[in-house]
Regions:
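Donor/substrate-binding cores of folate-linked one-carbon enzymes
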Residues: 21, 83-182
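Hydrophobic beta-strand scaffold residues
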Residues: 47-48, 76, 98, 125
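N-terminal beta1-alpha1 ligand-phosphate binding loop
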Residues: 2-38
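Short, well-structured alpha-helical segments in soluble
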Residues: 63-72
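Conserved acidic residues
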Residues: 25, 75, 96
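Short, surface-exposed acidic-centric catalytic microdomains
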Residues: 23-64
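N-terminal glycine-rich "phosphate-gripper" loop used for MgATP/nucleotide binding
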Residues: 29-30, 58, 72-88
Length: 183
């Protein structure tokens, strides 16, 4: 059975969708006060949290992550709102085993504000992308994408909600395609 870990920095809504359908070995957050940790507790999922500032440098921070991943024999790391750029230490240890979800149709609107950037650009549609993580920012090879239209009477809140709904469908589809067993 493939073991997965989820990395998230904040709310953890994508983590919750994943954890309700798939066995998650653990969730990691780079913020000790992130709501994702409460979600994990409620779902009975093991959680870890530590912050970059607790380490001498990013290489040491990522070495601690690699140690966790190896200790739990993780096969696939699912980034779900993890707002740190994966650096060379983690990438070298887990290249080809880290995926990310991005709330835009890449290569359009990479970076931390995909939904807002798409909205402000006035595009007719944006979407959701799951891709392999590489050394760039949202530049890895696309695994799967889905388009989300911007409706005539949309507010940014409605548009964002539809993008999140698309995310909640796409991550399980990708995990199924990788042969991750469901609960």
């Amino acid at each position: 059975m493939k073991k997965i870990a989820v990395f998230a920095s904040g709310n953890g809504s994508n983590f919750q969708v994943i954890a309700e359908e798939f066995p998650v070995e653990f969730v990691f957050s780079d913020h000790r006060d992130a709501y994702v940790l409460e979600r994990a507790d409620k779902l009975g999922v093991l959680s870890y949290a530590f912050e970059l500032k607790e380490f001498e440098n990013k290489a040491d921070y990522e070495a601690a992550l690699v140690e966790l991943l190896e200790e739990h024999q993780i096969d696939l790391v699912c980034l779900a709102g993890y707002m740190k750029i994966v650096g060379p230490t983690l990438l070298a240890a887990y290249e080809g085993r880290i995926i990310n979800i991005h709330p835009a149709y890449l290569p359009e609107f990479p970076g931390a504000h995909g939904i807002e950037d798409a909205w402000n650009a006035g595009v007719a549609e944006s979407g959701v992308t799951i891709h392999w993580v590489d050394s760039g920012v949202d530049t890895g090879k696309v695994i799967k994408q889905v388009r989300v239209p911007r409706l005539a009477d949309d507010t940014i809140e409605n548009f964002e909600a539809r993008i999140h709904e698309a995310e909640y469908k796409l991550y399980p589809e990708v995990l199924d395609s990788f042969g991750v067993e469901r609960k």
